[in-house]
Every structure is written in structure tokens, then in C-alpha cells.
């Protein structure tokens, strides 16, 4: 026999979007005693509708929380049906996953409370040992107590120690002062770490003092047409390929500053190649009449005056130690950076200075230069075969500039 089915149309009278009722979902259901009270709480700062249900009576507690995973995928409503109008009112009703907990089974143990007694367990143990222990045990307890440090008695001593340390360390340099001392001890010209252009990293006045720069007069070199006669006006005659090649490109009055740098470079090369000379008079004999103020400035910055030497400055003795040798070389490289527009080939320069390329690379890195294999564009500019470009080292300067840290190395072969 078939079952007859009827279909009724029900009108949705209203829908309440804001939660106005909540449904507690208890496993297998339950029947709450009449003395049970329930409270519903909502999290104020939560963007979602999150609720907490709490109820209790004399023996039981009821706890419920909004199921966030279920809430994200499902939406629950409670419908209030009006049979006369055949309409229904829908109320949003979050479901709270709930459970019943017996008060007798809850762990109501509170935090551990420290004993008010100041007696240490070891003190109690020692008291028993002194009362009932052997002579050997009593002696060990007495030695232990005699050597025990009482922190309370050390409070005043600790204050005195701190005051003594402060007094002793007040004259020690600060971190900034130590950085300044380290910077001054570097073998490089004074660097401008805030430079926004590569020319500002080692400005010319940090390489050649302004007072000395004005004594480098190169107008006669600029006016001279014959190249050999031009080279004869430089302070050191060593047939430098670099000086001769660079001189060909400095022919305009606007290049006067670079010509002054080239002149000073020639003088530094002369001092470096005669670094075993230990007397100013002998040094001047090997140079081509440079202004004496330039020589005095170089000797004051790049040499160590021998102790016990008195008399005229022209006759004084000095020596150039390994640190000052590196300092002269760093100044030479800084000048060459300016002359070569801050892109320098390592190999020809190493031949010019009679140094190993690795030594030149390490000095450039002390200056903060970046040393890498030549790029395709650089290889084309310098006429380097593409097959060897990656191993052909080029030194460049870039901004922002970071001053490299100085590291101490063990003594070893210099070159």
C-alpha cells in the first residue's frame, strides 16, 4: 500500500543575522537537574561569533566552546514555526561543543607554597650529623660550614667591588673612541663612510693635505709639448709605464687636479722604491727636486723616525717598517683609483709595483674595493679575451660604502 505524501509551503517571515540563541551539543545528550544554572559569554575582541558556555550545580560542571572549524563550514539556525500563518522565523544559533565534568574528579590542587621556615635542609642534616655523627663526619661538617659563602654578608663587598670597577674603568675608551682609534691606525686614507659618490669615499684632501697640494705646480708639465721633457719634470725617473701612459691622457687645463695626483703618485713611487734608504739627504739625491714640503709630509706620515736622532730635519734618519710599506701602497692604490675612474686592472698594476697579484688584491680589499673577474663589457673595454675574462681581476669602488673590518693575522711571508 502506497503512502500518500503532502507538500506544504512555509513562508520565511524573518531571518535574524545576529546570534540570539545558542545550542549546546552534548555527547549522547543529558538532562540537567533543576538547580543547574548556565551562563553564556561572548569574546569581545573576536571578529567571529565565539562564545563560551558555563553551567554548574552542586555536583557537576558544564563547559562549552564554539567550534571554529564547524563554524567556518556550517551555519546553524533555530526556526520558530507559526502553524496558523504557516510561517517560520529563523534565528542564527551558534553550536557550542560541550561536555559534563564531575567536580569530584577535577584537579583542584593549588600552586606549591614555599615553607616560611628559613632553615635549609642541609642545615638540618648537619645538625643531626653534629649530634649523632662520628668525629670524621663532624670535622667534615665544620670544614664545610667554615668554607661556606654567605651571600648576605657579601652584599656590602659586592657594592665595593662594583664601585672599584667603575672607578678603574672610567678612563677606558668607549666603543666609539675605540672605533676612531682603529680607523686612525688603518693603512688607508681617512674614508668617508657616508659618501654618495665613489669620488667622495677617499677625497683628495684625505690623500694629499691641502697645504701640500698647493705646492704641486704642474702648469709647466701641461704646457710642455714634448713627452720626454714632460716626464723629466716628474719627481721620480723610473720609466714608469703607468705614469707615461696616463700622462698621454692628461692634456687639458680641466685635468689639472688629476695631473697633480699623477705627480704625487710619482713621488710616492720614488719613496716606495727607495724604502731601504734611511736618510732624507740620500732620498733627495735619488729624487728629481720635488718640493721639500712634500717630502717632509711623506716622511712624517709614512716613516718611523729613529730614536736619538737630533739636528736638522734634512739630516735626520728614519726607517719604513712593513706597516708603513703597506700604508704607502694603499695611498698609491687610492690615487690610481681616482686616476682610472675607480676601475683598475690588477695584473698590469702588480707588474708595475713588482708585487704578486694576490698582494695587490688584499690591499684593494683593505681599501674597501670590490675585486671580481672582468665582466663582458669590461673585457671588451680593456681588450681582454673572453676566454680569460672570468679570471682577469678588476678592482672597483661602489656606494654605499662599507669600511672593511681590520683583522689581525699571524706573521708570514709578505710577498
UniProtKB/Swiss-Prot annotation:
Q: Name one Pfam family in it.
A: RNA_pol_I_A49
Record annotation: effect of changing residue 358 to A? Loss of DNA binding
Instruction: Identify the keywords attached in UniProt to this record, alphabetized.
Output: DNA-binding, DNA-directed RNA polymerase, Nucleotidyltransferase, Nucleus, Phosphoprotein, Ribosome biogenesis, Transcription, Transferase
Q: What is the effect of changing residue 365 to A?
A: Loss of DNA binding
Which molecular-function annotations from GO does this UniProt entry contain?
DNA binding; DNA-directed RNA polymerase activity
Question: Where do the record's region annotations for Interaction with DNA lie?
Answer: 322-415
Residues annotated with Phosphoserine modification: 34, 151
Q: Name one GO biological process term.
A: RNA polymerase I preinitiation complex assembly
The subcellular location is: Nucleus, Nucleolus
Q: Which InterPro entries match?
A: RNA_pol-assoc_fac_A49-like (IPR009668)
Q: Which GO terms describe its cellular component?
A: nucleolus; nucleus; RNA polymerase I complex
Q: How does it assemble?
A: Component of the RNA polymerase I (Pol I) complex consisting of 14 subunits: RPA135, RPA190, RPC40, RPA14, RPB5, RPO26, RPA43, RPB8, RPA12, RPB10, RPC19, RPC10, RPA49 and RPA34. The complex is composed of a horseshoe-shaped core containing ten subunits (RPA135, RPA190, RPB5, RPO26, RPB8, RPB10, RPC10, RPA12, RPC19 and RPC40) where RPA135 and RPA190 form the DNA-binding cleft. Outside of the core, RPA14 and RPA43 form the stalk that mediates interactions with transcription initiation factors and newly synthesized RNA.
Protein function: DNA-dependent RNA polymerases catalyze the transcription of DNA into RNA using the four ribonucleoside triphosphates as substrates. Component of RNA polymerase I (Pol I) which synthesizes ribosomal RNA precursors. Besides, RNA polymerase I has intrinsic RNA cleavage activity. The heterodimer formed by RPA34 and RPA49 stimulates transcript elongation by Pol I. Subunit RPA49 can bind both single-stranded and double-stranded DNA.
Family statement drawn from the similarity comment of this UniProt entry: Belongs to the eukaryotic RPA49/POLR1E RNA polymerase subunit family.
Specify the protein name. DNA-directed RNA polymerase I subunit RPA49
Gene name, per UniProt, is RPA49
